[in-house]
Every structure is written in C-alpha cells, then in structure tokens.
From Swiss-Prot:
Official protein name in the record: NTF2-related export protein 1
N-acetylalanine modifications at: 2
Function: Stimulator of protein export for NES-containing proteins. Also plays a role in the nuclear export of U1 snRNA, tRNA, and mRNA. The NXF1-NXT1 heterodimer is involved in the export of HSP70 mRNA in conjunction with ALYREF/THOC4 and THOC5.
BP term (GO), one: protein transport
Principal location listed in the UniProt entry: nucleus
Subunit structure: Heterodimer with NXF1. Forms a complex with RANGAP1, RANBP2/NUP358 and NXF1. Interacts (via NTF2 domain) with NXF1. Stabilizes the NTF2 domain of NXF1 by heterodimerization. The formation of NXF1-NXT1 heterodimers is required for the NXF1-mediated nuclear mRNA export. Preferentially binds Ran-GTP. Associates with NXF2, NXF3 and NXF5. Does not bind nucleoporins (NPC) directly, its association to NPC is mediated by NXF1.
Cell location: Nucleus; Nucleus speckle; Cytoplasm
GO cellular component, one term: nuclear pore central transport channel
Keywords: Acetylation, Cytoplasm, mRNA transport, Nucleus, Protein transport, Transport
C-alpha cells in the first residue's frame, strides 16, 4: 500500500465493514439459514474456543443456535497491509455489542472478522475468511 493511498484504503475498509456488519447481523437474527453463504468455503469460525470449518459445518452450527437479537455498540475496521495478504484485498473488522439468545440472559460479546474481497462480474463481494466470537464477562 502506498502511503499516499492509505486514506483511500481506510475509506474502502470502513464502507465494506459498515455494509458487512448490517448484512451479517441482520442475517444472523432473521435469516440464519443463509448465513454460511457469507463465508468462504475454507473459512473457520472459532466460537468461544470451539472451531468450526467449512460451509456445511457452519450451516449446521448456526442452525443449532437459539434465536438471537444482536445489538452492535462498536465497530472498528482497518485494511490489512498488502505484505500480510499479498494480492488479496483484506479487511479486519472488530465488533463489540450485546446479544440475547432465546432462553438466555443478554450478554456482552466481541467478534473479529477477516474479510477478503471476491471479485464477481458486477461488483466486489466480501467473504469471511476467519471469524472469532467470544462472550465477554466483566471482572469485578
């Protein structure tokens, strides 16, 4: 990344992250059966220390989760430097918020995504390469 273009990369990352967050959590709460389509075929999800890989396994995992209501409080994003992911446009997205799963109390969570740009004939589609979800328990 040339330093002169860095603001452009940051702007693209922020727009991609904002759009992604809206799509991801809306899909998680309302159309979960479609959620695995947002992941690359080789993507890995680590959910509170438990790893799930591949779209079929991801679909099965998401279908097992109770209904949810996510509230996003913080979104941070940044482009990943070209040296870390050569020839691949990549964005790191960090989310903090609260979630209420049916039958459970509301909890704080943190979720980190690594998104990669997948070119299609009409536009760029961002796919999840890596996803790490953690419940956050506050120390007293």
């Amino acid at each position: 990344m040339a330093s002169v273009d860095f603001k452009t990369y940051v702007g693209q990352a922020c727009r991609a992250a904002e759009e992604f967050v809206n799509v991801y959590y809306s899909t998680m709460d309302k159309r979960r059966r479609l959620l695995s389509r947002l992941y690359m075929g080789t993507a890995t999800l680590v959910w509170n220390g438990n790893a799930v890989s591949g779209q079929e396994s991801l679909s099965e995992f998401f279908e097992m989760l109770p209904s949810s209501e996510f509230q996003i409080n913080v979104v941070d994003c940044q482009p990943v430097h070209d040296e870390a992911t050569p020839s691949q446009t990549t964005v790191l997205v960090v989310i903090c918020g609260t979630v209420k799963f049916e039958g459970n109390k509301q909890r704080d969570f943190n979720q980190n995504f690594i998104l990669t740009a997948q070119a299609s004939p009409s536009n760029t589609v961002w796919k999840i390469a890596s996803d790490c979800f953690r419940f956050q328990d506050w120390a007293c």
